[in-house]
């Protein structure tokens, strides 16, 4: 399974829905067995009538940001500090083509090596950090 075909965590999916990322909403009886989240907790009296959304994959989210001019990329590198595993360096870039100038804003961040944040080599944790940064960047533009 590719890293890009893995599903993002439910809390990040809810943040992206609030951020206006379009997501597949299930109609009554249309559930297809893929990971989902409800807009209400099961304990809520409105749970039975709430909306249910399919949780997107990392690839879905990265493609959506790309369609908005925000590009998320990952570079893989090998490091002995991570017990001979690979680690990831992520970059988020914005290209504004609304006028003749192309503007590029980039941040790069190396995966944490100390085990507290990401334990190194974690595509999921790096991708979540990159997506959250892209959300902040989109709010600024």
Locations of the language-model features?
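Charge-rich, low-complexity N-terminal segments
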Residues: 1-48
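Short amphipathic alpha-helical segments that mediate assembly, nucleic-acid/protein binding
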Residues: 9-13, 58, 102, 106, ...
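Ampiphathic alpha-helical segments that act as solvent-exposed interaction surfaces
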Residues: 108-141
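N-terminal segment of the canonical double-stranded RNA-binding domain
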Residues: 22, 34-117
């Amino acid at each position: 399974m590719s890293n890009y075909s893995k599903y993002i965590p439910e809390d990040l999916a809810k943040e992206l829905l609030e951020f206006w990322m379009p997501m597949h909403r299930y109609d009554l009886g249309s559930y297809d067995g893929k990971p989902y989240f409800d807009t209400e907790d099961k304990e809520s009296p409105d749970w039975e009538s709430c909306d249910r959304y399919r949780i997107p994959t990392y690839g879905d989210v990265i493609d959506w940001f790309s369609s908005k001019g925000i590009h998320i990329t990952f570079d893989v590198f090998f490091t002995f500090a991570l017990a001979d595993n690979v680690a990831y360096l992520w970059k988020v870039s914005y290209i504004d083509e609304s006028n003749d100038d192309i503007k590029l804003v980039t941040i790069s961040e190396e995966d944490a090596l100390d085990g507290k944040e990401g334990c190194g080599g974690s595509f999921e944790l790096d991708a979540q950090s990159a997506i959250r940064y892209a959300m902040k960047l989109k709010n600024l533009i």
